[in-house]
Amino acid sequence: MSATPIPRTLALMIYGDLDISILDELPPGRQKIRTDVVDSRYHKRLYEFVKKQIAAGQQAYIVCPLVEAGESDLLPAEEYAEQLANGAFKGINLGVLHGKMNSKSKERVMAGFVSGHIKILVATTVVEVGVDVPNASVMIIENAERFGLSQLHQLRGRVGRGKAQSYCVLVSDSKSETARERLQIMKKYSDGFKIADEDLKQRGPGDFFGNRQHGLPELKIADMLSNTEMLALCRECADNIFCLLYTSPSPRDYAAS
């Protein structure tokens, strides 16, 4: 069971290695998450928006790609949280969560966020899965170009779990055409299978007989994306052949059919 299909999973489904059931409806009472892409010049407006959401009784996530400051110019979670606590969100209960914290500290922070005592949670991708806080309505992802489509889709799924309108804002100053295209895919689509399809186009399915989960397959002629209908027909024919082989006692009977 996967809430976030990855390219290789999608490829396996196309080639018939997996049977699937698709649940493509939102649970009752939930609204579609509004997603936007902005650059860092919008930070001040974002902070004001978060304050309004908190004043309305909601909570927010702010996700950073790093735990601590390094050689890059990316925003580290700990330093960023300190800046926000002493600046834009002074006086608002703010928590920090990342993978380098011990279990008790992480549990204490999450308990505070779940209870509503912590209004803003600055975190790394540790919140990507297994976090369910219906009262959280805002997800801000800093340096969003550093994340893949599957991760972005998972992170966005942390909000939109309650009845209030939820928002996901992808912040990026990247000039990379590939990165910008990836973020626009997130803005355009909310369906995980459509996002996986676009991810498949960008990254490829990987090896069919190896262990690479991305990259172009070593096929000389066939293209799984443009030949999807042909693949489905081939799968149906192969299934029919296997059924005949199992039900016919000899190859001669099979040939006659």
List each language-model region with its residue ranges:
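Inter-lobe coupling/hinge region of RecA-like P-loop helicase motors
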Residues: R30-V38, C64-L66, I92-S105
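Glycine/Thr-rich phosphate-binding loops of Rossmann-like dinucleotide-binding domains
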Residues: R8-T9, G70-E71, V131, L149
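A short beta-strand-to-loop transition that corresponds to the Sensor-1 phosphate-sensing loop
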Residues: M1-P5, G16-D17, P65-L66, T124-V126, ...
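Flexible beta-alpha connector loops of hexameric P-loop NTPases
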Residues: K32-R41, E71, A144-E145
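Post-DEXD/H (motif II) to motif III coupling segment of the RecA-like Helicase ATP-binding lobe
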Residues: M1-R34, R41-K51
